Structures are given as structure tokens and as C-alpha cells.
Amino acid sequence: FLVLLLVSLMCYAEIAEGSQPTECKYGRPCNSDRDCCWEYRCLSSGREYTCKQDPGP
């Protein structure tokens, strides 16, 4: 529950600071990391770029 609340607050913070509204959804099509919420990055899946969790180094 706390994680969901935190994600919601981060998305609302992005909207409040003037960024484009984003949907916090795994696998959402994107053009850059700005199209994704904090815990996701815009990564290639081979065919297209989608919001996914960053696997790290």
C-alpha cells in the first residue's frame, strides 16, 4: 500500500512541476525517461521503447 501511495505522489509531483502527465504503468510506450515515472526508465525491448524497471549496471 505504501509503495502505491508513494508512486501516486511522485506522479502528482511531476504534474505539479509542469512536466507532462504520465501514467505509472509498466510497459507504457515512451520516447525518453521523462515519459516514465521515477521507478521506471525508457528502455528498448528490441522493437520499441517502453517504461521498465532499470536492471542496473
Curated annotation (Swiss-Prot):
Q: Which residues form the propeptide?
A: 14-18
Asked whether the keyword Disulfide bond is assigned, the reply is yes
Tissue-wise expression: Expressed by the venom gland.
Domain of life, per lineage:
Eukaryota
List the GO terms this entry assigns under cellular component, sorted alphabetically: extracellular region
Any one Gene Ontology MF annotation carried by this entry is: toxin activity
Cell membrane: is it a keyword of this entry?
no
The protein's UniProt keywords, in alphabetical order, are: Disulfide bond, Ion channel impairing toxin, Knottin, Neurotoxin, Potassium channel impairing toxin, Secreted, Signal, Toxin
* SS bonds (residue pairs): 24-37, 30-42, 36-51
Q: Where in the cell is it found?
A: Secreted
The signal peptide annotation in the UniProt record is 1-13
Q: What else is known?
A: Negative results: does not show effect on rNav1.2/SCN2A and mNav1.4/SCN4A.
Q: Into which family does the record put it?
A: Belongs to the scorpion calcin-like family. KTX subfamily.
Described by its record, this protein's role is as follows:
This recombinant peptide inhibits voltage-gated potassium channels mKv1.3/KCNA3 (IC(50)=1.70 uM), mKv1.1/KCNA1 (10 uM inhibits 40% of currents) and hKv1.2/KCNA2 (10 uM inhibits 42% of currents). May also increase intracellular calcium release through the activation of nuclear inositol 1,4,5-trisphosphate receptors (ITPR) of cardiomyocytes, thereby causing an increase in the contraction frequency of these cells.
Written domain comment of the UniProt record: The presence of a 'disulfide through disulfide knot' structurally defines this protein as a knottin.
Name recorded for this polypeptide: Potassium channel toxin KTx1
Organism annotation: Isometrus maculatus
